[in-house]
Amino acid sequence: MDVLVINGPNLNLLGTRQPRFYGHKTLADINNDLLKIAKENNINIDFYQSNHEGQIIDKIQQTAAKIIIINPAAFTHTSVAIRDAFLAINKPFIEIHLSNIYNREEFRTKSFLSDIAYGCIFGFGPNGYTLALIEAINYINMKGE
């Protein structure tokens, strides 16, 4: 596998959950858009969503992906354990958020992942996933993997 896309808690509710912040696209819509781009670029992509921190950590530890795209959702601001999982596997990842976390409540402005991420994309709605995948493809091509 080339790219793993991980989505954290409550992202299974996209399309109906707070559309002011997150838009009207569902997670399935976003995944379908990414799958098309991946196929056009001969990239193998897999998708995973969980509301449970431990399951996300297990997925991070077990993946054979060359690069990970993650929207950790609320775990962004709370999970040292997810941070430690990324440090343990020593693989690049791109942190993504639909909304601009720096333009939200104060408690949402701290990310436990940003400083160790390959890159971060915030505030572009569902298009942020596309931007992240384009950069993941660039990374894979740059590494010649």
Swiss-Prot record:
GO terms for biological process: amino acid biosynthetic process; aromatic amino acid family biosynthetic process; chorismate biosynthetic process; quinate catabolic process. CDD domains: DHQase_II (cd00466). Pfam families: DHquinase_II. InterPro entries: DHquinase_II, DHquinase_II_CS, DHquinase_II_sf. SUPFAM superfamilies: Type II 3-dehydroquinate dehydratase. The record marks R17 as: Transition state stabilizer. Transmembrane segments: none annotated. The active site is at Y22, H97. Its EC number is 4.2.1.10. Belongs to the type-II 3-dehydroquinase family. HAMAP family: AroQ. This is 3-dehydroquinate dehydratase. It comes from Francisella tularensis subsp. mediasiatica (strain FSC147). The gene is aroQ.
